[in-house]
Swiss-Prot record:
The chain crosses the membrane at residues 19-39. It is found in: Cell inner membrane. Pathway: Cell wall biogenesis; peptidoglycan biosynthesis. Changing R210 to C/H: Impairs recruitment of FtsN to the septal ring. One of its GO terms (biological process) is peptidoglycan biosynthetic process. Changing L39P: Impairs septal localization. Inhibited by beta-lactam antibiotics such as penicillin, moenomycin, macarbomycin, furazlocillin and piperacillin. Antibiotics inhibit the activity by binding to the catalytic serine. Residues 578-588 form a propeptide. It is an enzyme of class 3 (hydrolase). It comes from Escherichia coli (strain K12). Keywords: Carboxypeptidase, Cell cycle, Cell division, Cell inner membrane, Cell membrane, Cell shape, Cell wall biogenesis/degradation, Hydrolase, Membrane, Peptidoglycan synthesis, Protease, Septation, Transmembrane, Transmembrane helix. It holds the Pfam family PBP_dimer. This is Peptidoglycan D,D-transpeptidase FtsI. Residues 40-577 are periplasmic.
Length: 588
C-alpha cells in the first residue's frame, strides 16, 4: 500500500507540473498574439494606412487663415484719392470656447465688452448662446483700431479679432453718385465701386497653421500669397468735380429745384472730367439715405432735349442745301394739322444765326419740313442720340429714340425742336463734345486715356464750324443765353426748356431747364451740359435758370485749366443779329 501511494504522488506532481507548463505556454501565446496584433495595428495605422488618423488630427489642430488684401484705390486723373481702404477690425466670438470657459457672466469685463459694442449684455448673451456648439459668430464689423485694442485687452475667452478694411471717400458727397460705395464685406454696391468691382478686388491668400488647444499657433504648414488688387485711375479731375458740384448745388437750392445734373467732357479725348448731381448724399455715412437718392441721374434719368438739338437741325439743312449760311427765314407762326407752331416772342423773319440766337421753333420746324423725315433721324443718330454711352456704369440708359416708318408733319416739326425723343444728360454731353470737335465722334470714357483719341468723322467740319460760330450769338446781347456769358471768353451754347412728362405719359405743368455748349469757341476744349429739374422759384426758362450755372461752371473750368482768353478785345467790331420783334433775353 505504501509503495503504491509513493508511486502515485510523483505522478500527480508530474501531471501538475505539466498542467502549469501548458497554461503558461497558452498565456504566453495569447500575450504574443496580442502584441503581434497591436504591433500589426500600429504598423497599419502608422505606416501602411495612416491617412485616417492624420486627417482626424488635422481636423483638431489645423486651421486655414485667410490672408486678406486691400481693395484697390480709386483716384482722379492726377492721382488724388477718391476712394481708399482703411484698416479696421472685426470682433467675433467662438460660442463653444465661451461656454467651455464658463459662459458669459455679469462680471466687469463682459459688461465692458457689451458697452464697447453698444449691445445690451442680455442681447450679447442671447446671440452667443443661440448656438452653443458653434465656432464662429460676428459681434461687430468695421470697428476702429482703438476700440479693437481696448476689447483685446479685456482678454475674454472666446472673443477674437479679425483684420478687415473699410472704404473711405475723401470727397464725400462731391463724388458720391459717380464713385458709389461698398457694403460691409467690401463688395461694390453702387457706381464705379460696383461697375469695376472685379478690377478693384484682389485675390486673398491663405495660411495653413497648426494650433494647440489654447488657440496658439505652434506651426506654419503652408501659405499662398495674396494677389494685390488693381488701382483705378478715373478721367475725373477732382478740382473740376468739386467746382461743378458746388455751383450745381447752389443753383438747385437757389431755384428750389427738385434736382440738378451736370456733365463736363474733354472734347479732344471723350474723357468725362466731371459728373455731378444735386442733391447728393454722404457715402461715408449712409444712415437714413433713401435708395432713390443714390441713383446717378446723369446716366439714369431721361428727358426731352428740347432746343438743344436745334444746332443739328441747322447743320442738316446746310448739308442738304435746303438753306445757305446767309439765308433769311419767314418765322411768322403757322399751323400744322390743327396745331400752332409759334415762338415765345413773335418774329417776322430771322437769319439762320437768328434762329439759333432766338431759339425759333418756327424756323427749325420749317427747315425740318423742307427735308425728308429720315434726315434729322440720321443726323441725331450720328451725333450719338439713341446710342449707348458705354461708360460701363450700372444703370446707364440709352434714352428713347423713335423707330417710326411714317411721320406726320406735326411729328416732324416737333422733332426739330427736341420733342418725341428722350436723352440722358450724358448723351447730350456727347453730342456737344462731337460738335466741339467739329464733327468728330469719340467714345466717352470714365477712365483716364492717353491721347490722341482719333475718333470718327460723322459730319463735315466746315458746316459744324459755321454752326458753332452761329451758336456764339446765343450768349451775346439779344440771345437767350446771355446770362451764360463769361468775361474774356467766347462760348458757343444752346439753352432749352421742356415740359416734363408725367407717369401717365402726358405733359404736366413742370419744366426742365438746360444749357449745353462748348468753350472756348475759337478752339473748343470742353463740352458742358447743365440740367435743372423742376425749378420752383418762379423762373423755369433755360436762359434764366441753367445758363447762369453754365457760365459759372465753365468760367471756373477755363480759369482752373489756364485756358487763354479768346474774346474780342475792346474796340473790335462784333456783329449781332438784328431781329424784328421783342427780345427774349433769358428765355429759351
Amino acid at each position: 500500500m505504501k509503495a503504491a501511494a509513493k508511486t502515485q504522488k510523483p505522478k500527480r506532481q508530474e501531471e501538475h507540473a505539466n498542467f502549469i507548463s501548458w497554461r503558461f505556454a497558452l498565456l504566453c501565446g495569447c500575450i504574443l498574439l496580442a502584441l503581434a496584433f497591436l504591433l500589426g495595428r500600429v504598423a497599419w495605422l502608422q505606416v501602411i494606412s495612416p491617412d485616417m488618423l492624420v486627417k482626424e488630427g488635422d481636423m483638431r489642430s489645423l486651421r486655414v487663415q485667410q490672408v486678406s488684401t486691400s481693395r484697390g484705390m480709386i483716384t482722379d486723373r492726377s492721382g488724388r484719392p477718391l476712394a481708399v481702404s482703411v484698416p479696421v477690425k472685426a470682433i467675433w466670438a467662438d460660442p463653444k470656447e465661451v461656454h467651455d470657459a464658463g459662459g458669459i457672466s455679469v462680471g466687469d469685463r463682459w459688461k465692458a465688452l457689451a458697452n464697447a459694442l453698444n449691445i445690451p449684455l442680455d442681447q450679447l448673451s442671447a446671440r452667443i448662446n443661440a448656438n452653443p456648439k458653434g465656432r464662429f459668430i460676428y459681434l461687430a464689423r468695421q470697428v476702429n483700431p482703438d476700440m479693437a485694442d481696448y476689447i483685446k485687452k479685456l482678454k475674454l475667452p472666446g472673443i477674437h479679432l479679425r483684420e478687415e478694411s473699410r472704404r473711405y471717400y475723401p470727397s464725400g458727397e462731391v463724388t458720391a453718385h459717380l464713385i458709389g460705395f461698398t457694403n460691409v464685406d467690401s463688395q461694390g454696391i453702387e457706381g464705379v465701386e460696383k461697375s469695376f468691382d472685379k478690377w478693384l478686388t484682389g485675390q486673398p491668400g491663405e495660411r495653413i497653421v497648426r494650433k494647440d488647444r489654447y488657440g496658439r499657433v505652434i506651426e506654419d504648414i503652408s501659405s499662398t500669397d495674396s494677389q494685390a488688387a488693381h488701382n483705378l485711375a478715373l478721367s475725373i479731375d477732382e478740382r473740376l468735380q468739386a467746382l461743378v458740384y458746388r455751383e450745381l448745388n447752389n443753383a438747385v437750392a437757389f431755384n428750389k429745384a427738385e434736382s440738378g445734373s451736370a456733365v463736363l467732357v474733354d472734347v479732344n479725348t471723350g474723357e468725362v472730367l466731371a459728373m455731378a448731381n444735386s442733391p447728393s448724399y454722404n457715402p461715408n455715412n449712409l444712415s437714413g439715405t433713401p435708395k432713390e437718392a443714390m441713383r446717378n441721374r446723369t446716366i439714369t434719368d431721361v428727358f426731352e432735349p428740347g432746343s438743344t438739338v436745334k444746332p443739328m437741325v441747322v447743320m442738316t439743312a446746310l448739308q442738304r442745301g435746303v438753306v445757305r449760311e446767309n439765308s433769311v427765314l419767314n418765322t411768322i407762326p403757322y399751323r400744322i394739322n390743327g396745331h400752332e407752331i409759334k415762338d415765345v416772342a413773335r418774329y417776322s423773319e430771322l437769319t439762320l444765326t437768328g434762329v439759333l440766337q432766338k431759339s425759333s421753333n418756327v424756323g427749325v420746324s420749317k427747315l425740318a419740313l423742307a427735308m425728308p423725315s429720315s434726315a434729322l433721324v440720321d443726323t441725331y443718330s450720328r451725333f450719338g442720340l439713341g446710342k449707348a454711352t458705354n461708360l460701363g456704369l450700372v444703370g446707364e440708359r440709352s434714352g428713347l429714340y423713335p423707330q417710326k416708318q411714317r411721320w406726320s408733319d406735326i411729328e416732324r416739326a416737333t422733332f426739330s425742336f427736341g420733342y418725341g425723343l428722350m436723352v440722358t444728360p450724358l448723351q447730350l454731353a456727347r453730342v456737344y463734345a462731337t460738335i466741339g470737335s467739329y464733327g468728330i465722334y469719340r467714345p466717352l470714357s470714365i477712365t483716364k486715356v492717353d491721347p490722341p483719341v482719333p475718333g470718327e468723322r460723322v459730319f463735315p467740319e466746315s458746316i459744324v464750324r459755321t454752326v458753332v460760330h452761329m451758336m456764339e450769338s446765343v450768349a451775346l446781347p439779344g440771345g437767350g443765353g446771355v446770362k451764360a456769358a463769361i468775361k474774356g471768353y467766347r462760348i458757343a451754347i444752346k439753352t432749352g426748356t421742356a415740359k416734363k412728362v408725367g407717369p401717365d405719359g402726358r405733359y404736366i405743368n413742370k419744366y426742365i431747364a438746360y444749357t449745353a455748349g462748348v468753350a472756348p469757341a475759337s478752339q473748343p476744349r470742353f463740352a458742358l451740359v447743365v440740367v435743372i429739374n423742376d425749378p420752383q422759384a418762379g423762373k423755369y426758362y433755360g436762359g434764366a435758370v441753367s445758363a447762369p450755372v453754365f457760365g459759372a461752371i465753365m468760367g471756373g473750368v477755363l480759369r482752373t485749366m489756364n485756358i487763354e482768353p479768346d474774346a474780342l478785345t475792346t474796340g473790335d467790331k462784333n456783329e449781332f443779329v438784328i431781329n424784328q420783334g421783342e427780345g427774349t433775353g433769358g428765355r429759351s
